[in-house]
Each structure stands twice: as C-alpha cells, then as structure tokens.
C-alpha cells in the first residue's frame, strides 16, 4: 500500500512539474531568474515525527539521511535522500521509518505531499538523576496528505528564491496565502497501551487555511524568509465519518529559511513544520508534530 501511494504521489508531482514549467510574468525589480540551465543540490535532511498524547511525549529513533538533487530549467526536479546510519541512542529501540516528502515550488502555487509510516516509539522521564525509557516497539503512526497553497502576490514574492534557490529575490516582499488540503492518519497502539488505547483507528480530514509569507533581503547575498498558515480541518474516524458527524481539527504549517547566495552557488538552512491534531473514537487527543530541517548546497550550471 505504501509503495502505491508513493508511486501515485510521484506521478502527480511529475505532471504538475510539467504543467507549471510554463513561464509566467514576474516583476523583475523584485524577482529575477538565474541564467543557468541546470542546478545540482546536495542536502542533509532531518525528518521527525513526535506524538503528544495524555501528557506524554512519544519519539522514535531517527536515522541520519543525506540526499542529492538535479533540476533542468524546464522545471523537472529530482530529489532523492537515503539513510546512511542510525543516530546513537541508549534506548535499545530501533524504529522502522518510511518518510517520503515532496515539495513543488511553483511560480504561483506551492504543493506539498508526504507519506509517513513510523513504528517504534519511546517516552522518557528522569528518575534519581538518570533517564528512564519506556519502549513501545509496535506503536505505529501512518499518515499521508496533500497540501496546495496559492500565493496571491506572486509577481513580487518568489517561493523559488526563498525555498528552492532557483530564482533571486532582489527586493523584500510578502504575500497573503490561501490553501487547502486532504489528509489521512492511522494510529495503531502497542500491546502495552491497551488499557488507555484499546484499538487502532484511522482519521480523514479536509480543510482550508490562510497565511502570510515574507522574504527579507538582508543584503545582496543574504535572504531570510518565512511563511506560516493556520486553519481548520473537518473530518472524523472512518467508522463514524458522515456529514452530520464531523469534528473540527486545528492545523498549522510553517516554513523558515536562511539563504546565502552567490552568482552560481548558494546554501540554505530550512525548516518545515507541519502539525496536525487527531482524535480517537473515545475522543482522546493526539498531537502530531512533524518538523523537517534541511541544510542544502546548490550549484548552478550553465
């Protein structure tokens, strides 16, 4: 099932890459194109998923990833990352993680797609000055979703300059954002959680959000940019999902990036924060916090 979702999402993004590759007018006093036909990227992503439930914080053990990417000026992007080694922990837990994310930074539209499958979490507390871990090796969280965000002031604010380093933001600018998305979540408890969470459940959500983005041109070399959107999703567990039985779920997504740009290369430190809330059939709340940080070096090639 996970590979089918990944294949469908990949196909969807390839089609959209081709569709949005058609050039659109920009205010060249604010945004300019690079003259290069290609870029090559090397990046180090750190993808995380934290669960907040019943005053407890659940974390998996994470691997360290590295990645490479390639883009031609027609708009076709290819970014691939893979695990190189697990980060050391003293929990004696080895989490199973599939974390697939795709981000399309268009001239007017931002598209985010993700599929996450995490199995194996732990909690920790202090006891007699030492860390004590409680392991939940079969506690599983699966989720996938698709977000679309429209940039209203797209002639002066460039998503690509801020988050892809494939355009140049010449003057500071901001824009109102309008977005919507569809999301699926499934939570499978560990056997040790049967008293507090007796059975697995899934959850469907659909909603809309509004936000703002701003790029601050600190100097000709440095750019600081951020965007944040907040909204409300509506949905419920599949067994009770009906128009007359919808719940409201708060949702938020944010981005922050610091870029250093030269004529033919750049580096960026970027954070993406995608947070959702779900409820079990017994109305228990689960906060799903999914931050991603990434260090990227981009080389532009003529």
Regions found by a protein language model. Give the residues of each.
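Outer-envelope beta-barrel architecture signal
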Residues: 34-40, 64, 74-76, 107-111, ...
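Membrane-embedded beta-strand positions of outer-membrane beta-barrel proteins
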Residues: 40-42, 68, 76-80, 111-113, ...
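Outer-membrane beta-barrel transmembrane domain signature
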Residues: 48, 62, 181-264
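Outer-membrane beta-barrel "beta-signal"
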Residues: 145-148, 152, 289-302
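Outer-membrane pore/translocation modules
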Residues: 34, 99-202, 272
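Bacterial Sec-dependent N-terminal signal peptides
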Residues: 1-32, 222-224, 297-301
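Transmembrane beta-strands of outer-membrane beta-barrel pores
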Residues: 44-50, 72-74, 82-86, 106-108, ...
């Amino acid at each position: 099932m996970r590979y089918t979702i990944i294949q469908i999402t990949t196909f969807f993004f390839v089609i959209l890459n081709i569709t949005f590759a058609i050039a659109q007018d920009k205010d060249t006093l604010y945004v300019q194109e690079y003259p290069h036909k290609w870029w090559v990227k090397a990046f180090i992503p750190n993808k995380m998923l934290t669960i907040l439930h019943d005053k407890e914080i659940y974390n998996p053990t994470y691997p360290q990833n590295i990645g490479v990417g390639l883009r031609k000026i027609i708009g076709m992007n290819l970014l691939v990352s893979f695990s190189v080694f697990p980060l050391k922990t003293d929990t004696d837990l080895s989490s199973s993680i599939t974390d697939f994310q795709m981000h399309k930074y268009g001239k007017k539209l931002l598209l985010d797609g993700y599929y996450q499958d995490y199995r194996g979490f732990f909690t920790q507390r202090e006891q007699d000055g030492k860390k004590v871990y409680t392991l939940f090796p079969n506690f599983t969280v699966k989720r996938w979703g698709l977000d679309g965000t429209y940039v209203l002031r797209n002639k002066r604010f460039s998503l690509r300059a801020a988050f892809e380093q494939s355009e140049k933001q010449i003057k500071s600018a901001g824009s109102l954002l309008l977005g919507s998305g569809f999301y699926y979540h499934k939570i499978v408890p560990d056997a040790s959680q049967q008293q507090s969470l007796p059975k697995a459940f899934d959850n469907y959500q659909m909603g809309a959000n509004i936000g703002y983005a701003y790029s601050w041109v600190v100097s000709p070399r440095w750019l600081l940019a951020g965007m944040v959107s907040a909204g409300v999703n509506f949905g419920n567990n599949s067994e009770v999902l009906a128009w007359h039985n919808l719940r409201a779920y708060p949702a938020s997504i944010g981005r922050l990036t610091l870029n250093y740009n030269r004529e033919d290369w750049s580096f960026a430190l970027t954070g993406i924060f995608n947070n959702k809330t779900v409820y079990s059939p017994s109305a228990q709340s689960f906060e799903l916090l999914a931050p991603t940080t990434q260090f990227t070096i981009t080389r532009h090639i003529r």
